[in-house]
Amino acid sequence: MSVSFHTQMARQEHLYKLTEEGLIVGGAILFLQGNVLNIGRIFVAPEHFRKGYGSFMMQEIESMFIGVKEITLDTPDWNIRTNTFYIKLGYTEIKRDRGLVYYSKRKLTENMIRLT
C-alpha cells in the first residue's frame, strides 16, 4: 500500500500505529461500522516479526473496541502464517473468496454469560 493511502487513512482516523522507542514497529487500519469492527489491515515491520507485536496489537484492538459485537478481517489464503495466527487468536473462518480467507470473532456482551 502506498504512502498516500496510509496518509489518507490517518486523516480519516482509521490508521493506528504501534511504536517502540519512537520508532513505528507496526500498525493497523480499522473501520468501525455500527457495532462491527473490521480490521482492514494489521502489519508489523519484518525486522520485528515473531516478537509478540502482532498478538499485542490484536489484544489492544479488542480492548479498545470493547463495545463491538463482532470483529472481522481477511487475509490471503496462501499466507499460512497469518491464517494460523488468526485461528490461534480465536477467529473463525466464515468464507473463502477470490484468494482471501474471511474471519470473524463474535464478542460476548456484558449481558451474556459464557458457560464452561
Show where each model-derived region lies.
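Conserved active-site alpha-helix within GNAT-family acetyltransferase domains
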Residues: 55-56, 63, 77-96
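Acetyl-CoA-dependent GNAT
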Residues: 1-41, 45-47, 58, 64, ...
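Residues that cap or initiate secondary-structure elements
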Residues: 34, 48, 79, 109-111
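Glycine-rich phosphate-binding loop
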Residues: 52
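Terminal substrate-recognition subdomain of acyl/acetyltransferases
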Residues: 74, 92, 99-116
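Acidic/histidine-enriched, beta-strand-rich ligand/metal-binding domains
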Residues: 48-49, 72, 85
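Conserved hydrophobic beta-strand within the GNAT/NAT acetyltransferase core sheet
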Residues: 39, 72-75
